[in-house]
Amino acid sequence: ITELKEDRQNQTPFFTKLKEYAESNPTPFDVPGHKLGRNSQELIDYVGQNMFLLDSNAPLGLDTLGHPTGVIKEAMQLAAEAFHAKKAYFLTNGTTVGILAMIMSICRAKEKIILPRNVHKSAINALILSGAMPIFVKPDIDSDLGIANGLSFSSVKKAIDRHPDAKAVFIINPTYFGMTSEIVKITEYAHEAGMIVMADEAHGADFYFSDKLPISAMDAGCDISATSMHKTAGSLTQSSFLLTQGDRIDHSRLQSTLNMLHSTSPSSLLIASLDVARKQMYFEGKEKIDKVLTLAKKARTQIKQISGLEVVDKTYVHERGNFDFDELRLIIKVSELGITGFEAYKELRRKFNIQLELAESHLILAVLSYSTTKDDIDHLIIALKDLSKRYYRIRHKLPKVKFSYSFPETYSRPRDAYHAPKKEVLLSEAGGEVAAEMIMIYPPGIPLVIPGEIISEAVLEDLNFYVENGSTLHCDLDNGCIKVVDKENWPKWESEEEDEF
């Protein structure tokens, strides 16, 4: 059986067929307009002709993503097998479209969904599009690092008990910083309550290929998971999988929802990269992840010896009551150097050409993957030692991290506020108003305010703090204003009437 499985997993149905087409030298009277790259010399000189030959638009024999019956279907079946799932769907609009599709296909208007407040913006957008009612659960907060972590079982159990009519529970596995929740216990309890369990696994694709990383959503029993193959497992940016198992998912409705959200011209390059990356991770993932975990362990040992720096490890995580942690995330606290994470991020990029994943007020985040090398780690250590040499003891350490993770009071469903009459107000004068748009810091793309929440002074202070320290504020307007509900012209304001949809 194992040999048969390996024979299957050694295949790349879509990529193989795509290569056959590219090598057949067709006369193109179809789109795309570059016609196999005939007039794209500047880009060809850099990336090569083959990229254009592979950039086809579903010619005969290459199947259709919206209704797969041939090589795409075969490739998705192999992906499902590799990822311990019943079905797998290719996503060429990123995990974002997977999260949109799972929530929209499962939750109808006004149906409740239990989810952590530190969800990605795509989950909030799905609430707006579906009309579902969020029941937010506060994540565990690490006040020393200034980050939101996973969910405890007790907090989710309390929400399930209080809202037994909820349709689904949504879990992040893991967070941007690699922290996981008690996903097995949460899933089992939610299933006992008759709820569907969804997972945002944007940063956990590699969990399926190593027992030394946290448990994956499918292995934990979740019904559906969106996982970014491109973030940690080697496919091209914007390519992901949507995985399902069990009998709780309406696959016909799910496919229909995906077809509503996906482009009708999906990138063959992205699909091919998913096909090939799946094969590579199946055969090489475990060994490569083992090697990079060894590098990560050595990196932590070295960083701990650098004056003014601290690095998170599993001992730190467990001592603070968190469940598990992806050790391929190097969370490095730099505030003892007297500089912010934002300053360290810029210094490492400008002086050492090191591109980190993100910065927060007191820390920086470096993401390792199966492709990280010893030379990469050595270069990072040299750069961190340089930071320490230049800043430690020269400047005073930063004050204790300012991180309250204030939760604004919810007044209405996100959908109601999004469609309500609006007006523009200065962000500095928005206290007490009902938000009509999302306001977030990016990365990581977690909204500090969502439509339907009452903007508090505490949230405004948090936003100002991030902006003053170099973060990018994402909102709809660029004139210092935000959109809020025009309460005087909104019949719902101080009314018991509910919107119909």
Regions found by a protein language model. Give the residues of each.
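Conserved N-terminal alpha-helix of the aminotransferase class I/II PLP-enzyme fold
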Residues: 52-94
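Structural signature of PLP-dependent enzymes
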Residues: 277-300
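PLP-dependent aminotransferase-like
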Residues: 110-171
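Conserved beta-loop-alpha segment that forms the PLP phosphate-binding cup at the N-terminus of a helix
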Residues: 87-113, 126
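Active-site phosphate-binding strand-loop segment of PLP-dependent enzymes
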Residues: 145-206
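N-terminal "arm"/small-domain region of PLP-dependent enzymes with the aminotransferase-like
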Residues: 1-70
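Conserved C-terminal alpha-helix-loop-beta "cap" of PLP-dependent enzymes
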Residues: 298-477
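Active-site PLP attachment segment
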Residues: 216-255, 262-273
